[in-house]
Amino acid sequence: MLSVNTIKNTLLAAVLVSVPATAQVSGNGHPNLIVTEQDVANIAASWESYDAYAEQLNADKTNLDAFMAEGVVVPMPKDAGGGYTHEQHKRNYKAIRNAGFLYQVTGDEKYLTFAKDLLLAYAKMYPSLGEHPNRKEQSPGRLFWQSLNEAVWLVYSIQGYDAIIDGLAAEEKQEIESGVFLPMAKFLSVESPETFNKIHNHGTWAVAAVGMTGYVLGNDELVEISLMGLDKTGKAGFMKQLDKLFSPDGYYTEGPYYQRYALMPFIWFAKAIETNEPERKIFEYRNNILLKAVYTTIDLSYAGYFFPINDALKDKGIDTVELVHALAIVYSITGDNTLLDIAQEQGRISLTGDGLKVAKAVGEGLTQPYNYRSILLGDGADGDQGALSIHRLGEGHNHMALVAKNTSQGMGHGHFDKLNWLLYDNGNEIVTDYGAARYLNVEAKYGGHYLAENNTWAKQTIAHNTLVVNEQSHFYGDVTTADLHHPEVLSFYSGEDYQLSSAKEANAYDGVEFVRSMLLVNVPSLEHPIVVDVLNVSADKASTFDLPLYFNGQIIDFSFKVKDNKNVMKMLGKRNGYQHLWLRNTAPVGDASERATWILDDRFYSYAFVTSTPSKKQNVLIAELGANDPNYNLRQQQVLIRRVEKAKQASFVSVLEPHGKYDGSLETTSGAYSNVKSVKHVSENGKDVVVVDLKDGSNVVVALSYNANSEQVHKVNAGEEAIEWKGFSSVVVRRK
């Protein structure tokens, strides 16, 4: 059994695995994919002994029995995602898989008959299908609007067929295989070469579908092209996807939402490979990359939900079916009892042999707390294309988590938000990211597609908590250019007193460079950690700099006086996302630090900030999302934007402090006022010092040299004193 340390240690030398040039499908009996003959025997003998497993199985059985009562319904394809025919075919493929499983475990032939009848109906219909009548613009399908859904149908349905194949007559097998499985495998592979060979989650689903079909049908050719690409050279296919789509830390370049989605084909196909060709040692490939990917997917969450960076729907979390199945497989391999903590939080069990092991271990009380770590997740196949930094302090669901997005673009699903950040605290998202503009499978909202506002708003830089120059998005909104560049990670540090991530972006705009350092600081006299943010920007030409902060909560007050637009609200701008923001208030600010305070649930948050710049034209803008949205596609959001005009240089410095407690039931409030008295910033010879003065007379001194030499001594004159430190950064708390 692989040790947990082996899996998590990203510095371990890669395990060299030789992959045979030609696949040799084993002669295993059926089922032989995700569930094996031995699994069936184990489940049948003991599933009622484990409450979690029995509850899940009985629930699935009840649901399937109700579905079966409706009869075999296989409509001709008509609707796009979210429409009736689309959803019915989705229900059908899940029913085929579940019926096959229940037939194996219970021996009740009604499940075999139902799965068989569904598959025979598809075998009769599929050969007559052309392109879907509501086909998607790219990679259209036949049964579904896009070929991606076709691949998902095959991944599920072939598992159901695997479970019933030994109970079918020869002519029934021939009809099903020649009518639907082989034609669909052909359509997804040789007839869709661009998608099949693509290093992308759509390609992963396609190769998994075709490869799993090959294992069940005993077709070496289907397995080999799935593993090595259509030309069998290894330049495409599953093995190349394992090489390219995950970083050495297990981070998927499109971000957590699509990492979650891609887990299913990766893990299920790998399980099928392990079952049929264990000599490949697929779960050890590339230094256990698939196991790391599952751990990383968990780490990319807070309070049960994934970080909504890039194209992401914010209601997706660790209870998603993809992670339920993946966790069971990884637990079976590692025996890591901290994964049981996640399994219990998921609230459901994978109905597989691996899921039985999870249920058994939970029932035996083996659960240990999962360790949500502060980690740096390198991006790109070699881990050298930027990184995602996750800093955590505290325990449980209410701990604080700071996310610094210093990653590569993330291909077509990426957003133009270099050096963006998010903050979580007290179980909530405090500094927020919009995610994607989409109502998945809600046909009334543009057929469930990504909305136009995904491009006009959600992907634009102004929709994020990062620097905007001259109201233009990063890379001027061009994804091809954006894919060529990534931030430079300058430093990552995780200590007891403070944590730090720092990165530089020099390509987002012509003639502009900006560096951002985010710190999570423990201050003994404060109840909660504080966030310190230092963003320096320099430009060749005088420019307008905007730095948004999207915050979640009800505004309490500002230290600055705002000018309200009483009679009319106007758009903040005309394009690049600005056209979707209503300008509510404006306020001129100067060189002294200012503050905004809001409340969320029972906790207050104060954002103290100061901007160092030669420009005398500084303003704070308060805006709301919703302009130019006639179809009400956009959620409400509020934003504080710090604007500097006609400047070549600016340093945006801020401190975010959680404080106090409000109890509406008891009608009590404590600590409603910020503990931060002022924020001061000094820059000298490319070094920064930030002094956070607290009301109790103490202060926090943050020093940044941007020099990685840990022995190099640095000095900055801050007022009447000289601040000295060694290395890239220093944080000192000085008591009164």
UniProtKB/Swiss-Prot annotation:
Grouped into one coarse class, the protein's main location is periplasm
**Record-marked site positions (Neutralizes the sugar carboxylate group at subsite +1):** N201, H202
Q: Which InterPro entries match?
A: Alg17C_C, Alginate_lyase_dom, Chondroitin_lyas, Hepar_II_III_C
Provide the biotechnology use note: Could be used as the key enzyme to produce alginate monomers in the process of utilizing alginate for biofuels and chemicals production.
- Obligatory cofactor(s): Zn(2+)
Q: Which gene encodes it?
A: alg17C
**Residues at which Zn(2+) binds:** H415, D433, H464
Q: Quick one: which residues bind substrate?
A: K136, Q146, S147, L148, N149, K198, H202, Y257, Y258, Q259, R260, R438, E667
What's the protein called, per UniProt? Exo-oligoalginate lyase
Task: Please report the organism this UniProt entry assigns to the protein.
Answer: Saccharophagus degradans (strain 2-40 / ATCC 43961 / DSM 17024)
Q: Which residues form the signal peptide?
A: 1-23
Domain of life, per lineage: Bacteria
Q: Which Pfam families match?
A: Alg17C_C, Alginate_lyase, Hepar_II_III_C
Describe what happens upon changing Y258A.
Complete loss of catalytic activity
Active site located where? Y258, H413
Report the enzyme's class at the first EC level: lyase
Q: What is the effect of changing H202L?
A: 20-fold decrease in catalytic efficiency
**Subcellular location(s) per record:** Periplasm
The annotated consequence of R260A reads: 2000-fold decrease in catalytic efficiency
Q: Write down the EC number.
A: 4.2.2.26
User: Can you tell me what the entry says about the temperature dependence of activity?
Assistant: Optimum temperature is 40 degrees Celsius.
- How does the annotation summarize its subunit structure? Homodimer.
